[in-house]
Curated annotation (Swiss-Prot):
This is Holliday junction branch migration complex subunit RuvA. The keyword Ligase does not apply. Has three domains with a flexible linker between the domains II and III and assumes an 'L' shape. Domain III is highly mobile and contacts RuvB. Residues 157-214 are annotated as: Domain III. GO terms for cellular component: cytoplasm; Holliday junction helicase complex; Holliday junction resolvase complex. SUPFAM superfamilies: Nucleic acid-binding proteins (SSF50249), RuvA domain 2-like (SSF47781). The RuvA-RuvB-RuvC complex processes Holliday junction (HJ) DNA during genetic recombination and DNA repair, while the RuvA-RuvB complex plays an important role in the rescue of blocked DNA replication forks via replication fork reversal (RFR). RuvA specifically binds to HJ cruciform DNA, conferring on it an open structure. The RuvB hexamer acts as an ATP-dependent pump, pulling dsDNA into and through the RuvAB complex. HJ branch migration allows RuvC to scan DNA until it finds its consensus sequence, where it cleaves and resolves the cruciform DNA. Pfam families: HHH_5, RuvA_C, RuvA_N. Homotetramer. Forms an RuvA(8)-RuvB(12)-Holliday junction (HJ) complex. HJ DNA is sandwiched between 2 RuvA tetramers; dsDNA enters through RuvA and exits via RuvB. An RuvB hexamer assembles on each DNA strand where it exits the tetramer. Each RuvB hexamer is contacted by two RuvA subunits (via domain III) on 2 adjacent RuvB subunits; this complex drives branch migration. In the full resolvosome a probable DNA-RuvA(4)-RuvB(12)-RuvC(2) complex forms which resolves the HJ.
């Protein structure tokens, strides 16, 4: 079974309400389904690391990719609930960030759960009841401190969340990313990009991270 892939993001694909990426690893192209939210954050022709859940059927196999091991494991917990298949699991993770989903399940927030495509009241109730105890293992998925906490308002990148998600998909951890954004905001690479310049922030962070690892 495939559990992890690292390769080059060749292209994104969409089939109906499903979206994903063609990931080239050692000369082989893998079609991996992602949440739409994750797919929109990918940069063309970039290196990409994904934690994989593989579903094997008689007519073939399907790969589902996630930017972190915790999110992949949360997906596996979701689809272990009766009536929640892989598409519903992806819909939940598209609608809610992992820490928001954990909070909704542990708090029995049925209205929030029902906002995900394909999740009705009965399924939401089943999620809240069946996962009340096991979801506690994901308590570490609490909202992280802001990447820009403590920065002057004119330095705060409005594109910070998108930059963070892209860097995580490239294999950087959250601590490295926070350090990079703070360093760029403090002028480590000259005048910081404007708050809405996602490409500028991403480019500056990648350059800073590359220098730090050299």
């Amino acid at each position: 079974m495939i559990g992890w892939l690292q390769g080059r993001h060749m292209e994104c694909w969409t089939q109906g309400n499903r979206s994903g990426v063609l990931l080239v690893c050692a000369g082989v192209g893998y079609e991996v389904q992602l949440t739409s939210r994750h797919q929109k954050q990918l940069q063309p022709d970039s290196e990409l690391t994904l934690w994989i859940h593989q579903v094997q059927r008689e007519d073939g196999s399907s790969l589902f990719g996630f930017p972190s091991r915790q999110e992949r494991d949360l997906f596996r917990l979701l689809i272990g609930v009766n009536g929640v298949g892989p598409q519903a699991g992806l819909a939940l993770l598209h609608e809610c960030k992992p820490q928001e989903l954990v909070a909704a399940i542990s708090g029995g927030d049925l209205k929030r759960l029902c906002q995900a495509q394909g999740i009705g009241k009965r399924t939401a109730e089943r999620l809240a009841v069946d996962l009340r105890t096991p979801i506690a293992a994901f308590g570490g998925l609490e909202p992280q401190p802001s990447l820009v906490e403590g920065l002057a308002s004119e330095q705060i990148p409005e594109a910070g969340e998108d930059v963070e998600a892209t860097l995580i998909s490239l294999g950087y951890d959250e601590l490295e990313i926070r350090r990079a954004i703070r360093a760029i905001a403090d002028g480590a690479s000259g005048v910081p990009p404007s708050g809405t310049d996602q490409d500028g922030w991403l480019r500056s962070c990648l350059q800073w991270l590359s220098r730090e690892s050299a």
